[in-house]
Structure formats: structure tokens, C-alpha cells
């Protein structure tokens, strides 16, 4: 059997901790690296910080009396410090853990994941025979996905009655474990093997869907969108079979469906399939009021934009922005689309004027204004003239007489535009109006 436990830990522990990640041991300076006592003290402090310190007890016998048996032989005893809200860890799952292993009455671990992967938690696949039996048995008797537990493992459930000389003694060992995550890779396979009566149960549905969603998230992060889509589609199929027994369970199933359809919309957007995005949004319409759901409206807009239906896209983006006025991403999209629409209108007008050999109106008058101001007014008039609907553009207050005369002169060259002036002096207001012909 290939053991997960590092049997050569004692020989390497000083080297590993000295050459380890500085963030893990910030208080260890270069001048103290050769000091064995400081190194051991830092090991002890780190286990405390990571909640991997050995608990206070008089003896393993006294400690074991307060634990529960995981095996009828008493070779594995467990004390759950903190348990997750999910199901028991599946026997064939992949777990992410930190552990520290201690001999009786020791305060420094003889082995720990803190010395592996630069101090990162260790990911282990259960059911492969690559870790000691006692550790695997204990992990499958706690609820995940997050938990803390202590395991007291006898030699028979660890490395055998003789240990692994010279490093591993033939003695009981205490494992202090922090479980960070559980990945149920075979949930879908197990679900398909269940009878229909089991498949419809709420607990089975939730466990399977959570596993499929977790796997889909990992695939999405790796940009494997097609595989993620398959997982979300399977999650929808599982949810449709579910028969919740209470109103709360029914609401939970509904929320999971909403989540799955939204994630499918995102994945289809990533794979450039706007019609599929629309289909997912329409599925959401049958579950919730999408007019009150910003993300659904956003992807309605995305789908229409991808299909070239700019006006429809703007309509949905505006609805989404109304729900989340501070959403900068939606605001930027609307601003970009507005600019694109204006540019398109101006270019379209220029194209038709050229097609009919009509020159763009221009003024020959000379005004006592800045050339940039005159150019900006002309551009604005061309943009307004290119619009098909009524429009009104308010100019800043405080314009000089020459600036107002310049505006009037340029506007007069556009038959569909007019200038509206009201007020006097500093209160004078000037606006350019696009009339409907």
C-alpha cells in the first residue's frame, strides 16, 4: 500500500520549515534559521494558527474515553469539533484537508500537511488505497464540506502493528484534521444507479445537484464551457425529477433551477450561442419574474446584442440598470452602444447623401468663435439630423452672443433642426431640437 503519510518527516522537518513559505512563518528571520529550538517553536505556533494543535489531555486512554468508535474494534476513535451542514463525506470523493499527526503527549507533530505544497491544504482521493485506513474511515464519518475533527488511530488501522521503522513507531497516533472541501466526483453516476423512488428524494437531489454544480464551477474556471454546460443540464434533469415534501424544500428546488438556468445562460454566452442564451432566459421567465432579476435582464440584453438587435438589447440593459443603478458594467455597455448607434446614424446619413449626390450642408458664414467650438456644433447637428426620432439637446448656460449666433447659423443649414432660445443674460437657455418631418 502507498501511504499518504510522510514517513521521513522528522529528517526533513527542519529543512522544510526553514525553506518554506515566508508568509506561513513571518516571524522566522534568516539569522534564526539555524536555531533548532526556534524552528520547533515556530512549528508549534503554526499548528495553533491553523487550528491543528494537539488538544490538552492526560493520556490517549483518557482522550479516547471522550470519543466515539468508528470501528467495532475500537481501532479508530473520533471527536468532531465542528461539523458541516452537508451529507457525510462520500467514500469515493476527493477531499481537501490539513492534518497534523502526534505521538502521545507530543506538542510537535511528527507529520503534517503544513510541510507539503508550500503549506497549502492537501487534496486526497478517497477509496484508492493510498492513505492509511484509519484516516479514510474517520473522514467518511463526518459531514462536509467543512469540518474539524480529531482521530485517535491504533497501529492496526494505520501503518500496521510493527509501524514503519525507523521513523514510524508501532504506537497510536492522534490526527488533528481540518476538512476544507469535498468534491463528489461520482455523484451523477451513483444517482443514475438509484431506483426512481430514491432519485425523487429531496436529500438525494440536493446532494447530486451540489456535486454537479461544484464540478461545473471548476470546469468553468478552466474555460471548459461545453463540459460545464453538460453538468448544468444534468443538474436540471435531476431537479425536474425531485419531489419535495415541504414548501421550504420546494422553494430550494426552484432556487436551484434558477441558478442552473442562469449558469447555462452564462456558458452559452461564452460559447457564442445567443439563441440558446435567449432560451435559458425564457426558461427563467417560467420560474421567476425576470423583470425584477438584474442578471436575467442582463443576459437578455447580451443575447439580443449578439444577434444584432441593438434596440432590444438597449431596452433590456436599461431595465437591468434601473434595478442596479450603480452597476458600472451595464452603464459602460449602454454608453458604448449609444456611441455606436450615433456613429452608425451619422455614417448612414453620409452614405445616403453620397448615394444621391447631396453634399453635407455647410455654412460659409464667419463667426467670432473658437474653431473647435464651431466644429463641435457642426458634428452635433449632423448627429441629431441622422436620428429618426424626436430629440432635444440642451446646451450649457452662459453662451456668448457670438456663440449663439454661430449655433443658429449652423442649425439653419439643417432643415430638420431648429434652435430654441429662452431667458435673458446669464439665465439664457439654448437647445437644439430635432423635428419629426
From Swiss-Prot:
It is found in: Cytoplasm. One of its GO terms (molecular function) is Hsp90 protein binding. TPR repeats lie at residues 209-242, 258-294, 295-327. SUPFAM superfamilies: FKBP-like, TPR-like. Signal peptide: none annotated. Keywords: Cytoplasm, Differentiation, Meiosis, Oogenesis, Repeat, RNA-mediated gene silencing, TPR repeat. SMART domains: TPR. The keyword Nucleus does not apply. GO terms for cellular component: cytoplasm. Interacts with Hsp83. Co-chaperone required during oogenesis to repress transposable elements and prevent their mobilization, which is essential for the germline integrity. Acts via the piRNA metabolic process, which mediates the repression of transposable elements during meiosis by forming complexes composed of piRNAs and Piwi proteins and govern the methylation and subsequent repression of transposons. Acts as a co-chaperone via its interaction with Hsp83/HSP90 and is required for the biogenesis of all three piRNA major populations. PANTHER family: INACTIVE PEPTIDYL-PROLYL CIS-TRANS ISOMERASE FKBP6. This is Inactive peptidyl-prolyl cis-trans isomerase shutdown. It comes from Bombyx mori (Silk moth). The gene is shu.
Amino acid at each position: 500500500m502507498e501511504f499518504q503519510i510522510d514517513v521521513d518527516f522528522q529528517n526533513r522537518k527542519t529543512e522544510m520549515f526553514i525553506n518554506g513559505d515566508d508568509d506561513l512563518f513571518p516571524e522566522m528571520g534568516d539569522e534564526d534559521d539555524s536555531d533548532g529550538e526556534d524552528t520547533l517553536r515556530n512549528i508549534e505556533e503554526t499548528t495553533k494558527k491553523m487550528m491543528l494543535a494537539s488538544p490538552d489531555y492526560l493520556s490517549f486512554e483518557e482522550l479516547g474515553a471522550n470519543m466515539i468508535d468508528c470501528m467495532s474494534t475500537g481501532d479508530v476513535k473520533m471527536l468532531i469539533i465542528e461539523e458541516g451542514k452537508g451529507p457525510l463525506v462520500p467514500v469515493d470523493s476527493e477531499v481537501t484537508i490539513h492534518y497534523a499527526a502526534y505521538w502521545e503527549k507530543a506538542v510537535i507533530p511528527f507529520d503534517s500537511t503544513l510541510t507539503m505544497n508550500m503549506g497549502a491544504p492537501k487534496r486526497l482521493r478517497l477509496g484508492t488505497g493510498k492513505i492509511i485506513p484509519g484516516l479514510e474511515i474517520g473522514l467518511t464519518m463526518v459531514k462536509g464540506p467543512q469540518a474539524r475533527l480529531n482521530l485517535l488511530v491504533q497501529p492496526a488501522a494505520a501503518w500496521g502493528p510493527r509501524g514503519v521503522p525507523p521513523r514510524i513507531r508501532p504506537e497510536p497516533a492522534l490526527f488533528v484534521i481540518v476538512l476544507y472541501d469535498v468534491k463528489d466526483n461520482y455523484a451523477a453516476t451513483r444517482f443514475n444507479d438509484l431506483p426512481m423512488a430514491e432519485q425523487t428524494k429531496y436529500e438525494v437531489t440536493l446532494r447530486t445537484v451540489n456535486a454537479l454544480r461544484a464540478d461545473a464551477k471548476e470546469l468553468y474556471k478552466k474555460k471548459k464551457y461545453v463540459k460545464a454546460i453538460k453538468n448544468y443540464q444534468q443538474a436540471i434533469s435531476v431537479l425536474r425529477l425531485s419531489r419535495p415534501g415541504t414548501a421550504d424544500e420546494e422553494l430550494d428546488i426552484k432556487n436551484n433551477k434558477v441558478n442552473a438556468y442562469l449558469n447555462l445562460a452564462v456558458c452559452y454566452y461564452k460559447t457564442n450561442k445567443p439563441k440558446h442564451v435567449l432560451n435559458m432566459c425564457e426558461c427563467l421567465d417560467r420560474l421567476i419574474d425576470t423583470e425584477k432579476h438584474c442578471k436575467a435582464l442582463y443576459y437578455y440584453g447580451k443575447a439580443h446584442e449578439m444577434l444584432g438587435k441593438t434596440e432590444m438589447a438597449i431596452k433590456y440593459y436599461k431595465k437591468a440598470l434601473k434595478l442596479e443603478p450603480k452597476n458600472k458594467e451595464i452603464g459602460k455597455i449602454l454608453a458604448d452602444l449609444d456611441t455606436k448607434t450615433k456613429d452608425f446614424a451619422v455614417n448612414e446619413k453620409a452614405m445616403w447623401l453620397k448615394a444621391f449626390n447631396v453634399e453635407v450642408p455647410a455654412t460659409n458664414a464667419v463667426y467670432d468663435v473658437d474653431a473647435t467650438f464651431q466644429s463641435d456644433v457642426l458634428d452635433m447637428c449632423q448627429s441629431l439630423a441622422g436620428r429618426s426620432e424626436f430629440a432635444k439637446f440642451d446646451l450649457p448656460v452662459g453662451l456668448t452672443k457670438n456663440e449663439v449666433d454661430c449655433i443658429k447659423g449652423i442649425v439653419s443649414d439643417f432643415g430638420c433642426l431648429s434652435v430654441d432660445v429662452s431667458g435673458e443674460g446669464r439665465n439664457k437657455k439654448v437647445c437644439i431640437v430635432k423635428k419629426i418631418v
